[in-house]
Curated annotation (Swiss-Prot):
Gene3D superfamilies: Spore Coat Polysaccharide Biosynthesis Protein SpsA, Chain A (3.90.550.10). It is a single-pass type II membrane protein. This is Beta-1,4-galactosyltransferase 2. GO terms for cellular component: Golgi cisterna membrane; nucleoplasm. It comes from Cricetulus griseus. Belongs to the glycosyltransferase 7 family. Its EC number is 2.4.1.-, 2.4.1.38, 2.4.1.22, 2.4.1.90. Its cofactor is Mn(2+). Residues 59-75 have a biased composition (Polar residues). The gene is B4GALT2. The lineage of its organism: Eukaryota, Metazoa, Chordata, Craniata, Vertebrata.
């Protein structure tokens, strides 16, 4: 009996031992399987986000790197590869009333005026007579157009006084001297038309055009060379006329039109050869298109004229009075749309751009441009 009981206990102990061994093996297998899963998880996390330990996690509604950053597929923010550099300073717009104006300026034409001196006085002016103020952004880009022939002496004085004045006015501008080639009869208005087109060829952003005789110098820098809602007449009080407007419709000397205003009147007439008449024709064009003349205060719009004799081949135009009477008809076909000329040379000088052109002669269409 005892022998039978001992055999039974031995078999039970062996069975328990086998069960314990089986349980141990199952536990070991499960342990290594869980360990492998954890190792794979942390390996993937380390590859995707190597810099995670250096940057704290951000909430889903906040991005601390840059406004356009996006979250990764794991829900964690992506770390930028490089931080953005400093932004360029914003240049403010130029004020309506420039702070550096001096008002009335003493003008004299007795001292010698070499171009080298004028160039030294205006170091900020770039080749071709271009200037942009460094401390503000102007609202307009201004082209100053000068009809010209054989007036080098006058031009030096004009540049001497005008460059500093235009810089004080905080203008972005360029100076264009339109030089009529040859000795045919002078045609001021046609040269101004040429200047309008040639300036736009160089810089299509020009939106204001100042047309100035080379012998007229403003006496007050508060006479701002800008364009407004209406065509502007600047030279309203010349010493030549006793500092008074000679007549109500006078539009001579120095005037300004925006690009849109100039095109609205079909530019200036091309058929006024010789002295006189074209200014009155331009006034008629402005009136006929429903615009009005804007002028500065008479105390500000004062000018000095450099005295000179009448130019050869610029005699008074005997047809000017009859032409003025027909502006309503002639402005439709005579103007910027019918302009013909030929550019002979473009020379960019330190203080201005010289454009020499062949504009033909009276009753001639030989200049095909």
């Amino acid at each position: 009996m005892s022998r039978l009981l001992g055999g039974t206990l031995e078999r039970v102990c062996k069975a328990v031992l086998l069960l314990c061994l089986l349980h141990f093996l199952v536990a070991v297998i499960l342990y290594f399987d869980v360990y492998a899963q954890h190792l794979a998880f942390f390996s993937r996390f380390s590859i995707r986000s190597p810099a995670h330990a250096l940057y704290p996690a951000a909430s889903s509604s906040t991005n601390c790197s840059r406004p356009n950053a996006t979250a990764s597929s794991s829900g964690l923010p992506e770390v930028p590869s490089a931080r953005p550099g400093p932004t360029a300073p914003v240049i403010p717009p130029c004020p309506d009333v420039p702070p550096g104006l001096v008002g009335r300026v003493v003008i004299e034409f007795t001292s010698p005026m070499p171009l080298e001196r004028v160039q030294r006085e205006n170091p900020g002016v770039l080749l071709g007579g271009r200037y942009t103020p460094p401390d503000c952004t102007p609202a307009q880009t201004v082209a100053v157009i000068i009809p010209f022939r054989h007036r080098e002496h006058h031009l030096r004085y004009w540049l001497h006084y005008l460059h500093p004045m235009l810089r004080r006015q905080r203008l972005r501008y360029g100076i264009y001297v339109i030089n009529q080639h040859g000795e045919e009869t002078f045609n001021r208005a046609k040269l101004l038309n040429v200047g309008f087109l040639e300036a736009l060829k160089e810089d299509a952003t020009y939106d204001c055009f100042i047309f100035s005789d080379v012998d007229l110098v403003p006496m007050d820098d508060r006479n701002l060379y800008r364009c407004g809602d209406q065509p502007r007449h600047f030279a309203i009080a010349m010493d030549k006329f006793g500092f008074r407007l000679p007549y109500a419709s006078y539009f001579g000397g120095v005037s300004g039109l925006s690009k849109a205003q100039f095109l609205r009147i079909n530019g200036f007439p091309n058929e006024y050869w010789g002295w006189g008449g074209e200014d009155d024709d331009i006034f008629n064009r402005i009136s006929l298109t429903g615009m009005k003349i804007s002028r500065p205060d008479v105390r500000i719009g004062r000018y000095r004229m450099i005295k000179h004799d009448r130019d050869k081949h610029n005699e008074p135009n005997p047809q000017r009075f009859s032409k003025i009477q027909n502006t309503k008809l002639s402005m439709k076909w005579d103007g910027i749309g019918s302009l013909r000329y030929r550019v002979l040379e473009v020379s960019r000088q330190p203080l201005f751009t010289n454009i020499t052109v062949d504009i033909g002669r009276p009753m001639s269409w030989l200049n095909q441009g």
